[in-house]
Amino acid sequence: MCDDEVAALVVDNGSGMCKAGFAGDDAPRAVFPSIVGRPRHQGVMVGMGQKDSYVGDEAQSKRGILTLKYPIEHGIVTNWDDMEKIWHHTFYNELRVPPEEHPVLLTEAPLNPKANREKMTQIMFETFNAPAMYVAIQAVLSLYASGRTTGIVLDSGDGVTHTVPIYEGYALPHAILRLDLAGRDLTDYLSKILTERGYSFTTTAEREIVRDIKEKLCYVALDFEQEMATAASSSSLEKSYELPDGQVITIGNERFRCPESLFQPILLGMESAGIHETTYNSIMKCDVDIRKDLYANTVLSGGTTMFPGIADRMQKEITSLAPSTMKIKIIAPPERKYSVWIGGSILASLSTFQQMWISKQEYDESGPSIVHRKCF
């Protein structure tokens, strides 16, 4: 809290979902899709008080007549006009607070381009007139939320996956690795392998159904080959799912074949290292003296790490890559879907953090580049 007990606003903008709320709370008040929709045909929505754009859940529910855009691709903001709309919606419709009365903590992807941080800073001060703001790296916030300041974070959301080694609260940029394989790709892959079973999901509405199947029924196998054999020889792994129209579908080995692609991207036709190898490669780019601390503090974060079995599998895979005497610990906090936001809530409510905010006055004196001096 600031001197006069005004709660800071914490906004975590993800590729798939935006999480927003008040510093000091233990969970975000608002979680909505990061999408902006515009009517495909002017005048189609007669008498609806024709709006020229819709954001979040409203865009989702009217998607039949809208063209949907995601302003954040692979974790990085690519469309600033739409991003501004999402922030406006966050402050005025979701949180219902005037941003000019609250400090705002925003999150950014690791390796976010410098120009992007400046643009975020500029929009907060010039468009929304925030009294103060700060930009924090997502993975660092997840680590804080787990009660650590040193460790490596595997952060996997809807649009991108990063491995971020952090030492004493600072991300080590030379060792950060990015993998363009995340939740959206897994949903696409699941719809593809369900097609092989004869179930077709093509429209955006049906994509949402596949995402729900993924979230409710998929899991990571400890031993993929063995699990495939079990699935082939018995029906013990089969589960049924009721579609909105009442039809019931059965899903078997798809349950673990879908998230297996995190460990074997070749299943998606991608020639890249899996999340376990990427984590290992990231650790190997760090100074030899801190590797031990990273192996022992490997923290999972983001919605795509929510699959049951993922921590055990990571433990197994990293153990086989690392030196045999190394102590390896994978930390998978139950609230990891929102741990970036939670870390932001913790950070922004610390009394020691209050001097870290970029104030409107500092911005007016130095311009957008102030963000590089104050936020690192």
From Swiss-Prot:
Major localization listed first in the record, in broad terms: cytoplasm
Primary enzyme class: hydrolase
Pfam families: Actin
Entry's transmembrane regions: none
CDD domains from the UniProt entry: ASKHA_NBD_actin
Keyword annotations: Acetylation, ATP-binding, Cytoplasm, Cytoskeleton, Hydrolase, Muscle protein, Nucleotide-binding
Catalytic activity, reaction form: ATP + H2O = ADP + phosphate + H(+)
Location relative to the cell: Cytoplasm, Cytoskeleton
SMART domains on file: ACTIN
Cellular component, GO annotation: cytoplasm; cytoskeleton
Enzyme Commission number(s) of this protein: 3.6.4.-
Modified residues (N-acetylaspartate): D3
Propeptide, residue positions: 1-2
Molecular-function GO terms, alphabetical: ATP binding; hydrolase activity
Tissue and organ distribution: Expressed in the muscular cells of the sheath surrounding abdominal ganglions.
InterPro entries assigned to the protein according to its UniProt record, in alphabetical order: Actin, Actin/actin-like_CS, Actin_CS, ATPase_NBD
Matching PROSITE patterns: ACTINS_1, ACTINS_2, ACTINS_ACT_LIKE
Subunit structure: Polymerization of globular actin (G-actin) leads to a structural filament (F-actin) in the form of a two-stranded helix. Each actin can bind to 4 others.
Similarity comment text for this entry: Belongs to the actin family.
Reported function: Actins are highly conserved proteins that are involved in various types of cell motility and are ubiquitously expressed in all eukaryotic cells.
Name used for this protein in its record: Actin, muscle
The organism of origin for this protein: Aplysia californica
